[in-house]
Regions:
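Nucleotide donor/acceptor-binding cores
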Residues: 21-32
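Hinge/beta->alpha junction and helix N-cap segments in small-molecule ligand-binding domains
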Residues: 7-18, 34-56, 60-77, 90-97, ...
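Phosphate/pyrophosphate-binding loops at sites that engage ATP/ADP/AMP, CoA/4′-phosphopantetheine
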Residues: 26-27, 80-83
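Flexible loop/turn connectors
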Residues: 83-87, 91-174
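A generic structural signal for alpha->beta connector loops
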Residues: 4, 59-61, 109, 127
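Conserved acidic residues
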Residues: 5, 30, 86-87
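A short acidic, helix-capping loop that chelates divalent metal ions and anchors anionic groups
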Residues: 2-6, 121-124
Length: 174
């Protein structure tokens, strides 16, 4: 980032920590399968930091596997590793959907949580915790920041709020 660049995001580390903590505590879990995003990605690293902090804070064990933000890859990871874990935490909703489908296929129940708050989560039979980013507010703030930069202002980092939600089918239908 430089003087002419503004970065707008949520606190990726804290958001991952928050949604995983809620899911872990709601179901009294101790053994975590964390399905991370793309190897060496900034968002992946930030979210993994949140998970490592949670593991330390709550004295959990965690296995980390790459899911590449892919539903199919996450499904395969869950098929291979979820059986001996108490919870599956995913770095994206799409991966959470893949992991949940794997658990359904194996006929086992494990809580699963995602990240992003995508509409598709509302179509999954089980409601999962996820992080909702207020893209309207983020977009509005981005327009304000562009205007400021165009008028000689300096760039800076802007951290926007996030929330933990469950996506329900009834909330997404018209």
């Amino acid at each position: 980032m430089n003087a002419r660049t503004t970065y707008i995001s949520i606190d990726q580390e804290q958001a991952q920590y928050d949604v995983a903590k809620k899911t872990v505590l709601d179901d009294n879990c101790k053994r975590v399968l964390y399905i991370a995003g793309r190897r060496d990605g900034y968002v992946t690293e930030q979210r993994l930091k949140g998970m490592k902090r949670l593991v330390k804070d709550l004295d959990l064990t965690m296995m980390v596997r790459q899911g590449d933000f892919s539903e199919l890859t996450a499904r395969n990871v869950a098929l291979k590793y979820a059986k001996n874990k108490d919870v599956v935490v995913c770095a994206s909703d799409l991966m959470a959907i893949g992991a949940m489908n794997a658990l359904i296929d194996m006929d086992i129940f494990r809580p699963v949580c995602g990240f992003d708050g995508i509409t598709l989560m509302g179509y999954v039979g089980k409601q999962m915790n996820t992080i909702r980013q207020d893209f309207y507010s983020i977009s509005s703030r981005a327009v304000e920041e562009v205007h400021q930069l165009m008028n000689g202002g300096e760039g800076h980092q802007v951290i926007m709020p996030h929330s933990i939600v469950k996506m329900y089918y009834k909330d997404i239908i018209c």
